[in-house]
Every structure is written in C-alpha cells, then in structure tokens.
Amino acid sequence: MAFSSNVHANETCKTLLATGNPEYPPYLWRDPEDENRLIGANAEWMQLLSKEIGIPIDIKYIGPWGRVQEEAKLGRVDLLAGAFFTQPRLEYMDYFYPAFRETRTVIWTRSNFTLPYKKWSDLVGKQGVTVINNSFGEEFDRYAKESLKISMVPSLEQALKMLSLSRADYLIYEEDPGLAYVAKMNISGLKTVAPPITNENLYLTLSHKSACNTPEMRGRIAKAVYKLDKQNVMSKLITANIQLWRKQQSK
C-alpha cells in the first residue's frame, strides 16, 4: 500500500503551487520584475523546503490575502507560505510544526496622539483599523469582535493612510511588515506602542483539497520543516530581505 500511494503522490505531484499574503515584506511581496511571482524571506525558505522534499515549489501571486485563503479552501493552491493558527482554518488546511517564524503584532498610532495603552481594554472607545481577513490569534480576535471598534480595509497602505490622516486612532498590524511599508510610503509621524498585542507563530499549511495532500507527502514536508527549523535559517533570510525590500523601494 505504501508503494502505491507513493506512486500516486508522484504522479499527481510534479510541482506544488504555493502562495501567501502578498503585502507582507520582509516575508512576502510581489516581485517588481515579475508581478505574478512572490519573493521574500518566506519564498526563499520555501525554495529550501523544495530542495529537501525533491519537488519544485512555484510561489505565485494569486491575489490579496482574503482571496488567497479562499483559494486554499477550494484546493486551487497547495501550500500557504505563512499562516497564523486559527480553529476555522483547521477545517480546510493541515498545519506543519514547528512554526518557521514568530512575529510580533503591535499597536501603531500617530506620534502626536496620546494613546495610554498597556492592555487590550485600553483600546475600548477608540477607533481602530486593520486589514481585512487578518487574524491576530484567537483570543484577541474574539476580544476585538466583542469589545472593540475596528474598521477593516483591503490593504495595509490604505490603513496607514487612514491612520496618518487621523481617520483612525490606531492600527493593528505586525511590526516588521508595518515598518517596511512605512519606509516605502515615506510616512513620518507614526510610532508603535508597547506591549505587543500578540506574539504569533507563522506556519506552513497544506490545503485539504490539494491533490498533493497524501500521508506520504505530509510526512515528507513535516520532516523537511523540522530539519530547516534546526538549521535556524529564517533569521538570516529576514535580515537579507529587509535590505532587498528597502533597495527595491528606493529605486
């Protein structure tokens, strides 16, 4: 049986199609020289994974993050190169452990705006903004839904503009991607406030409906993820890709 499932996996899995959040430097963003391609630290990590499992991984731009998740649900993409853990996502994707990166989600506000923030409840009564379909961990997502006033917008650029034009009191977003976009848009007068909203793990996921989702393939990917984690490659990739993103934006 093991042999026949291997043959089946090899027949249906000549390549794997991967995608992710395209507004996510230094992790992922669209290649300025080929807008159908995603580049960044996660994309480079996926190429190392590809070598380990012996199957080419094609990292394509599919659309914004909301659409990406829909495509994963339908099995039109195989892998997501970076997703937070949420219960609803378990219904359509398998997660691989360990996580390949821990990220910090922070509160952004204007430098001249006083936001006395030490805990989540300090945000009650203030107008927040974030990007549609973003999750910041189950606990915060639930709290935000029940207690906070947060507008959802399609892109991080729009959210940062709203914040700098005082149409929102605060923005919730991850620190590294936020810093990358602030640099790109040349916005000044914004700051982050401590403590972080959450420290969240980024995982590799495989769609349940992917033709490549076989026990043999899951085992192969799981082994490779474990090996790459032990080699601690991600920190080096992030440093290099922050530099690459800045260089591209200043052209």
Would you name each region that the model predicts?
Residues P22, E102-V106, A183-A222, L244-S250:
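Periplasmic-binding protein-like
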Residues G66, A83-E91, D169-N199:
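A ligand-binding cleft/hinge motif common to bilobed small-molecule-binding domains
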Residues T15-P22, L28, K119-N134:
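Short loop->beta-strand "edge-of-pocket" segments that line small-molecule binding or catalytic clefts
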Residues P56, S135-S151, G189, K223-K251:
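Ligand-binding clefts/hinges and TM-proximal coupling segments of bilobed small-molecule sensing domains
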Residues N10-F84, E91:
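Extracytoplasmic small-molecule ligand-binding "clamshell" domains
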